[in-house]
């Protein structure tokens, strides 16, 4: 043994394992006897032999532990190392992304489609309020109820199918040919476990409802056949029979009681639940039809008579079942009507502005909300221009547009044209002679040159994914926090708030005009049936508001031309009148007859000036007005000096 070469720790371990197996073979019979003598029949001879087998040697244990230590160190190093998609967190020239750009949602919370509005719990109340003002809220409510009916009906049908399967499995007879050693104990234990649970016991007591008399008789006979089998099992296994004797003796009584209960019970709970589910489906379908589709409905949806008959046929099916898709076609028609007639107006209404204000003031504004909303992107581009980083935004917009066009064509695009467009972006932002260099490193530039742009067949749609990801992260981590705390962001919010107030002011005046016409507020507008009449009434109300709008408007004097101060309607002294030398009170608040009133309010004059600008005609008109004012002032002074001279002569 000393001269034998050391086989190594692994071989030593396997040899000791083989010795343990030999000992297991030789100690099979004695270990079985020992297990019987200590009254432990549950422990097999094989498990007892494995307990006596020798373990690995200390050399093998040390070798295995060394391997485990090295594996744990490598695993720890792998965990500490950043994944392949996790690039460096520093920004450098343009920054690195720690996000997967492909997974970024190209959706903005500030711009929504109709489907997104109907499925968003935040903006949906604003849309319902808008439709209520137009008296079209029944379209939205029908779509929501039909969508809820569609989803809940399928879930109820699945529940009904599961209950049917459970009922059929519980009604299966017990086979009398189950002959194995421990048959009595599992059967009785499962029966007791099912009877211990209240719901299972109730189901078992009433499981045979709907089965004919022959099936009930066969089930009773099958249950009764268990008792001789249990006697045989007790003869083979005395210990197991002792533990389950009481349960096996009660088996025939329980089966008879179950059979009698099944005969006496009027209905099964499973069938009752299934029946209630199907009745609830029918009730919901009838309620929706009565509220929105029936000709007698208060506000029916705009569908044809043929479509109404088709919905009736799907609700009252030949098999007695309601089709879950009975309202799908009507949903599509209502959806297209809302999208074509109302949704564009909703996006321009103060209701959607209120929703945008709620999103912008929620504290969770993301970069996608800004980049995919035109109004927010306008203010963001101004901020990026002030920060001398507008080239990053322009690159992102151009590259994203480049990638979206070939992707929309699903591979059917001109490779040469795509390569020319990609070269324009490369020459502008990536090359060493770039006109607007963004600071991409050599790795990114070589990747775009060799692998993406110079590819046979043209560049792939995702050729600018890496620089797009870097530009996205730079804007998100560096510039987005500054924009959200800048004055331009608050100006954007202020503009939204002013637009909401203006729209509410117009809506309030229109409602007052409708009430003043003599009709009650709940009735439709008098000109609701005539679109031209309604439009003319709205125009009249808006003109009336604009005439008095200069009283409430706040004008920044610094933004106006100082010469416009001479264009005031009442440019006299800040007095109501004066007393002459003769003691006569002369009113100055009355306009002079030779001075013409300026047409339009301050708001209209400001709008004219903003539209016309500093043109030659405007300057000439302003000069004539100033000259007239000077002449009138001289004439007034001459008239004031004339009574004094006459009194001196006297």
From Swiss-Prot:
Keywords: Cytoplasm, Membrane, Mitochondrion, Phosphoprotein, Repeat, Transit peptide. One of its GO terms (cellular component) is mitochondrion. Coiled coil: none annotated. The keyword Transcription regulation does not apply. One of its GO terms (biological process) is protein localization. SMART domains: RGS. Residues 1-16 form a transit peptide. Its main location: mitochondrion. It is found in: Mitochondrion; Membrane; Cytoplasm. Residues 622-635 are annotated as: PKA-RII subunit binding. Residues 113-356, 366-493 form the RGS domain. The modification Phosphoserine is found at residues 40, 268. It holds the Pfam family RGS. It comes from the Eukaryota. RII-alpha binding site, predicted to form an amphipathic helix, could participate in protein-protein interactions with a complementary surface on the R-subunit dimer. Differentially targeted protein that binds to type I and II regulatory subunits of protein kinase A and anchors them to the mitochondria or the plasma membrane. Although the physiological relevance between PKA and AKAPS with mitochondria is not fully understood, one idea is that BAD, a proapoptotic member, is phosphorylated and inactivated by mitochondria-anchored PKA. It cannot be excluded too that it may facilitate PKA as well as G protein signal transduction, by acting as an adapter for assembling multiprotein complexes. This is A-kinase anchor protein 10, mitochondrial. It comes from Sus scrofa. The lineage of its organism: Eukaryota, Metazoa, Chordata, Craniata, Vertebrata. The gene is AKAP10.
């Amino acid at each position: 043994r000393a001269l034998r070469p050391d086989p190594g720790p692994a071989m030593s371990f396997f040899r000791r394992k083989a010795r343990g197996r030999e000992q297991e073979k030789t100690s099979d019979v004695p270990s079985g006897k020992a297990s019987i003598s200590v009254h432990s029949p549950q422990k097999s001879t094989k498990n007892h032999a494995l307990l006596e087998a020798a373990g690995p040697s200390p050399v093998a244990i040390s070798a295995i532990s060394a391997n485990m230590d090295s594996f744990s160190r490598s695993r720890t190093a792998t965990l500490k190392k950043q994944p392949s998609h996790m690039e460096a967190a520093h920004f450098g020239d343009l920054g690195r992304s720690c996000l997967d750009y492909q997974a970024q949602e190209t959706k903005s919370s500030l711009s929504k489609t109709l489907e997104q509005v109907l499925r968003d719990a935040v903006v949906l109340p604003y849309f319902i309020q808008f439709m209520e003002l137009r008296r079209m809220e029944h379209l939205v409510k029908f779509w929501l109820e039909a969508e809820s009916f569609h989803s809940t009906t399928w879930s109820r049908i699945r529940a009904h199918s599961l209950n049917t399967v459970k009922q059929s499995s519980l009604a299966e007879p017990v086979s009398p040919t189950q002959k194995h050693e421990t048959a009595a104990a599992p059967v009785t234990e499962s029966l007791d476990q099912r009877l211990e649970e209240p719901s299972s016991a109730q189901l078992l007591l009433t499981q045979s409802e709907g089965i004919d008399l022959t099936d009930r008789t066969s089930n009773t006979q099958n249950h009764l056949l268990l008792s001789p089998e249990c006697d045989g099992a007790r003869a083979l296994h005395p210990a197991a029979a002792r533990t389950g004797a009481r349960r096996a003796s009660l088996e025939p009584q329980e089966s008879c009681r179950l059979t009698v209960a099944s005969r006496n019970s009027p209905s099964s709970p499973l069938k009752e639940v299934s029946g209630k589910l199907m009745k609830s489906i029918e009730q919901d379908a009838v309620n929706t039809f009565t509220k929105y589709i029936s000709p007698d409905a208060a506000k029916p949806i705009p569908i044809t008579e043929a479509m109404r008959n088709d919905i009736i046929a799907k609700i009252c099916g030949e098999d007695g079942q309601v089709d879950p898709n009975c309202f799908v076609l009507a949903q599509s028609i209502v959806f297209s009507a809302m999208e074509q007639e109302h949704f564009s107006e909703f996006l321009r209404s103060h209701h959607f502005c209120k929703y945008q204000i709620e999103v912008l003031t929620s504290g969770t504004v993301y970069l996608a909300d800004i980049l995919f909303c035109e109004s927010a992107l306008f203010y963001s581009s101004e901020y990026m221009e002030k920060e001398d980083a507008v080239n990053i935004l322009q690159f992102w917009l151009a590259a994203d547009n480049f990638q979206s066009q070939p992707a929309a064509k699903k591979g059917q695009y001109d490779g040469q044209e795509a390569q020319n467009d990609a070269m324009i972006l490369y020459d502008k932002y990536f090359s060493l002679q770039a006109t607007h260099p963004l600071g991409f490193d050599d790795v990114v530039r070589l990747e775009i040159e060799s692998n993406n742009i110079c590819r046979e067949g043209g560049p792939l749609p995702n050729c600018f994914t890496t620089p797009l990801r870097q530009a996205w992260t730079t804007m998100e981590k560096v510039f987005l926090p500054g924009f959200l705390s800048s004055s331009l962001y608050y100006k954007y919010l202020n503009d939204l708030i002013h637009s909401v107030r203006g729209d509410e002011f117009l809506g309030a005046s229109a409602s007052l005009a409708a009430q003043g016409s003599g009709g009650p507020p709940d009735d439709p507008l008098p000109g609701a049936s005539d679109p031209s009449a309604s439009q003319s009434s709205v125009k009249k109300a808006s003109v009336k508001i604009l005439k008095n709008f200069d009283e409430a408007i706040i004008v920044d004097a610094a933004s106006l031309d100082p010469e416009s101060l001479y264009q005031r309607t009442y440019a006299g002294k800040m007095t109501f009148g004066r007393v002459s030398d003769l003691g006569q009170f002369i009113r100055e608040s009355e306009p002079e007859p030779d001075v013409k009133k300026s047409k339009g309010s301050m708001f209209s004059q400001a709008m004219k000036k903003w539209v016309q600008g500093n043109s030659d005609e405007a300057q000439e008109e302003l000069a004539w007005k100033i000259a007239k004012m000077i002449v009138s002032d001289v004439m007034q002074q001459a008239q004031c000096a004339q009574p004094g001279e006459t009194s001196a002569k006297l």
